[in-house]
Design a protein with these regions (language model features):
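Conserved GNAT acetyl-CoA-binding A-motif
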Residues: 105-120
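Short amphipathic alpha-helix that is part of the acyltransferase structural core
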Residues: 1-54
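C-terminal "cap" of GNAT-fold acetyltransferases
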Residues: 143-166
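Conserved acetyl-CoA-binding loop-helix of GNAT-fold acetyltransferases
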Residues: 84, 90-105
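Single conserved hydrophobic/aromatic residue that forms the stacking wall/gate
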Residues: 185-195
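Conserved beta-strand in the GNAT
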Residues: 54-65, 78, 83
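Conserved active-site alpha-helix within GNAT-family acetyltransferase domains
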Residues: 119-141
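A conserved beta-turn-beta hairpin within the catalytic core of GNAT-like acetyltransferases
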Residues: 66-79, 89, 173
Length: 196
């Protein structure tokens, strides 16, 4: 029997689970907030695709230009979360989900896929070794344990990069107090607010 994957939309998200927290009742409020956030992000081209089972087998990605990650990757899709767990590992689900993201990138005329991973394995991030075996390349490594990987569709496209503030540890604003604010109803990446 062939695996069935579904893509969540504003129309079906209320009746579908989002994989992240269905096994932990303590996360109910966060779970509902994430669903609200997803509904807003779907309008920005965000995709949440999962196995049509009660399982943690899914991929989330969207336009890198709108990603909440300190990366410069114009015309790429940013993989934010990619998870295949438990008995579903080794069954081809990861490859199928990744291939669906590649197909979306090609259909949109994107230059490729990009993601941030732990240089050493972090339990909350994509598996760098697996992604490298799938054709991703390490574009940049940070000294404190994170790497930027890319899978180029357009080999002539410029490499993505971490924002300069990631390496320097300093924000661009130097006067007053800088506050980074994130609200669930905001559909644009968090922007600094400078208060003098």
């Amino acid at each position: 029997m062939e695996a069935k994957y579904i893509t969540l939309t504003k129309e079906n998200i209320e009746k579908e689970h989002i994989c992240c927290a269905f096994s932990d009742k303590k996360c109910k409020d966060s779970y509902e907030l994430k669903k609200t956030w997803l509904k807003n992000e779907f309008e920005n081209g965000y995709v949440f695709r999962r196995l049509d089972e009660r399982a943690k087998v899914f991929i989330e990605y969207g336009p890198a230009e709108k990603a909440w990650v300190p990366v410069n990757a114009p015309n790429y899709l940013m993989i934010n979360c990619f998870w295949v767990s438990g008995k579903y590992k080794g069954c081809g689900h990861g490859k199928a989900l990744l291939q669906s993201a590649v197909e979306d990138a090609k259909a949109q005329g994107r230059d490729g896929l990009v993601t941030v991973v732990g240089t050493s394995k972090f339990h909350f991030m994509g598996d760098a070794k697996w992604l490298l075996r799938q054709g991703f390349e390490t574009i940049e490594k940070l000294p404190y344990g994170f790497s930027l990987l890319a899978l180029k569709i357009n080999s002539a496209a410029p490499d993505p990069s971490f924002n300069g503030t990631v390496s320097s540890g300093e924000c661009e604003e130097k006067e007053g107090v800088v506050v980074y604010l994130s609200l669930i109803h905001i559909s644009e990446p968090t922007r600094p607010i400078s208060i003098s």
